[in-house]
Amino acid sequence: MQERHTEQDYRALLIADTPIIDVRAPIEFEQGAMPAAINLPLMNNDERAAVGTCYKQQGSDAALALGHKLVAGEIRQQRMDAWRAACLQNPQGILCCARGGQRSHIVQSWLHAAGIDYPLVEGGYKALRQTAIQATIELAQKPIVLIGGCTGSGKTLLVQQQPNGVDLEGLARHRGSAFGRTLQPQLSQASFENLLAAEMLKTDARQNLRLWVLEDESRMIGSNHLPECLRERMTQAAIAVVEDPFEIRLERLNEEYFLRMHHDFTHAYGDEQGWQEYCEYLHHGLSAIKRRLGLQRYNELAARLDAALTTQLTTGSTDGHLAWLVPLLEEYYDPMYRYQLEKKAEKVVFRGEWAEVAEWVKSR
């Protein structure tokens, strides 16, 4: 059974999206995991805690004996069945535990006894995690062009369409504003960083990459923050600013935040609950900036939002949302972005409408 243990092996695993059967406890997996990993634990959280306590009090032999006692009989058989099925479904995969220690070796030996030879990651998740961190540090040293522009400028789509683009908001599962949440929960910080590293490695491997195209993001994207090595490089990067007509921006925002989000919520929850979730999503976004709007203006816009939702529910039209969206852009989002852009005006190297910026980026 060939084990993977070199730096290049670890990178190759991430680039290839190699399926990883992660046998750590769920609590460990939730704190941080690799993008292509599935969690099929040797021990659940309670069993792991009990073995850990035993190890501290009585030593490794007693802890190992307790582990075998806890994972025995029907419990062991159920977990064996799950591992066997995963191995057969992912014949090119690998086993992984925290450090390539006892847990992955135990599962590997049990599978071998059942007639399945399956490799493991020597060094475990810790080695893969260190590889992800180091890869991000190295790849972030390449030149970066940032795509800037006011809300609704189509920055994310422009980045997505570039072969050297990395969609930071897509990886973070958040669009970076008060209304930025999606139906997918955000990953833990470590898992987000691992996903970003894998995406950068894959993008770099597909081409002779000269520079990155990224969206001009703040440090935080929802609850995730950009790795400091990348954030530092972004603060030094050139910026291309999309300056589309206001009406085109409104069309994009209508499609993204009203039509698409309503569709996504109803698709996920059904018509009735989906509508309630959609309404709560919009109200939550507006409420998040209440303090900056001021109570009186917030109440006015919230009332317009309620009226727009009533119209949308009864007629299907989203046009009523313009009554609160337009002043929100004119009074809050646009002035805020222009203020932020003024502070880095010396880094702006190109301005134009969406298609012009896209063409300029391709020529870099």
Swiss-Prot record:
Active site: 97 (s-selanylcysteine intermediate)
Keywords attached to this entry: Selenium, Transferase
Catalytic activity: 5-methylaminomethyl-2-thiouridine(34) in tRNA + selenophosphate + (2E)-geranyl diphosphate + H2O + H(+) = 5-methylaminomethyl-2-selenouridine(34) in tRNA + (2E)-thiogeraniol + phosphate + diphosphate; 5-methylaminomethyl-2-thiouridine(34) in tRNA + (2E)-geranyl diphosphate = 5-methylaminomethyl-S-(2E)-geranyl-thiouridine(34) in tRNA + diphosphate; 5-methylaminomethyl-S-(2E)-geranyl-thiouridine(34) in tRNA + selenophosphate + H(+) = 5-methylaminomethyl-2-(Se-phospho)selenouridine(34) in tRNA + (2E)-thiogeraniol; 5-methylaminomethyl-2-(Se-phospho)selenouridine(34) in tRNA + H2O = 5-methylaminomethyl-2-selenouridine(34) in tRNA + phosphate
Residues in Rhodanese domain copies: 14-137
Record-linked Gene3D superfamilies: Rhodanese-like domain
EC annotation from Swiss-Prot or TrEMBL: 2.9.1.3
Family: Belongs to the SelU family.
HAMAP family: tRNA_sel_U_synth
Oligomer status and interactors: Monomer.
Protein name from the UniProt record: tRNA 2-selenouridine synthase
